[in-house]
């Protein structure tokens, strides 16, 4: 989510630079660090503890949460913080891991898990993608096209499920243009310079050095692609659970994952193509 207009002196409006993964310098996007944590610290009423790997939520004899036990990642020692209220916001799987690791007499199956569903109904987005190149765009003049992408071109779901053999839906995202190169840009060049001439020259696939740099510049901005991102059906049998034998480097039991796509997700992905 982005801000389309300035709301205060702390956050500005999105300028559509398209580099959200590099963090937003005007705080126009939503992220917990800039929108929640930073303003909270500025109040002077919040202590932020970094390098803390939460182990479990501590409870009293009545089974009520009393604080958190964590391992300091720098000295590998365990510490405890007492609290009147404990809120977990550790993402889907890590929150489930904390709850399942927080066993006690009152909570033998893990905290807040009397229903037995913590960790179950785990699902992700479905997806299928395709890409290609437009030869007419080879070697073109450089422009700043950082904003081109999902922010500008998007196809929402509009089909009638009654006429399809799967539930839910998906949207389609598009990408391409001369966006700012990131890590890995230009890799796989053997699939390009072995098929198309570069500035009128036929080359072998691959290459290195000055010739490879020429090829990367020549093909830059000619790639286009589209990808479908859909909604899966939550099912009880798809789950994460605590591994009884494996712990991480801090001695905290890790998660096992048991998930697979149903025929609905497979049919949805085929429909995307």
Residue ranges and their predicted role:
Residues 10, 23-30, 88-89, 112, ...:
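Hydrophobic alpha-helical scaffolding
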Residues 115-266, 270:
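FAD cofactor-binding and catalytic pocket of flavoenzymes
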Residues 63-69, 223:
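Short, hydrophobic/aromatic-rich segments at coil-to-beta transitions
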Residues 37-38, 119, 273:
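Short amphipathic alpha-helical segments and helix-helix/interface helices
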Residues 18-24, 82, 253-263:
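Glycine- and acidic
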Residues 53-54, 65, 236:
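A broad structural signal for short, well-ordered beta-strand segments within beta-sheet-rich domains
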Residues 26, 43, 52, 56-60, ...:
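Glycine-rich loop(s) and the adjacent beta-strand/alpha-helix scaffold that form part
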Residues 1-54:
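Conserved redox-cofactor binding core of oxidoreductases
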């Amino acid at each position: 989510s982005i801000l389309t207009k300035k709301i205060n002196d702390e956050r500005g409006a999105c300028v559509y630079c398209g580099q959200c993964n590099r963090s937003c310098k005007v705080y126009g996007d939503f992220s917990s660090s800039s929108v929640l944590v930073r303003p909270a610290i500025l109040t002077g009423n919040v202590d932020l503890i970094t390098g803390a790997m939460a182990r479990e939520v501590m409870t009293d004899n009545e089974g009520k949460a009393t604080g958190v036990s964590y391992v300091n990642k720098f000295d590998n020692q365990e510490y405890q913080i007492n609290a009147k209220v404990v809120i977990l916001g550790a993402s889907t799987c890590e929150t489930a891991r904390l709850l399942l690791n927080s066993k006690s007499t009152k909570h033998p199956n893990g905290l807040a898990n009397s229903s037995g569903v913590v960790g179950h109904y785990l699902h992700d987005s479905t997806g299928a993608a395709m890409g290609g190149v437009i030869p007419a765009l080879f070697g073109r003049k450089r422009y700043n096209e950082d904003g081109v992408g999902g922010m500008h071109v998007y196809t929402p779901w509009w089909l009638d499920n009654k006429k399809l053999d799967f539930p839910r839906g998906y949207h389609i995202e598009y990408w391409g243009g001369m966006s700012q190169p990131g890590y890995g840009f230009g890799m796989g060049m053997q699939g390009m310079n072995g098929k198309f001439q570069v500035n009128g020259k036929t080359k072998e696939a691959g290459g290195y050095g000055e010739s490879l740099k020429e090829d990367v510049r020549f093909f830059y901005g000619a790639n286009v692609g589209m990808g479908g991102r859909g909604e899966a059906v939550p099912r009880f049998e798809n789950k994460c659970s605590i591994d009884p034998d494996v712990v991480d480097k801090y001695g905290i039991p890790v998660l096992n994952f048991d998930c697979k796509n149903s025929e609905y997700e497979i049919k949805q992905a085929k429909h995307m193509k």
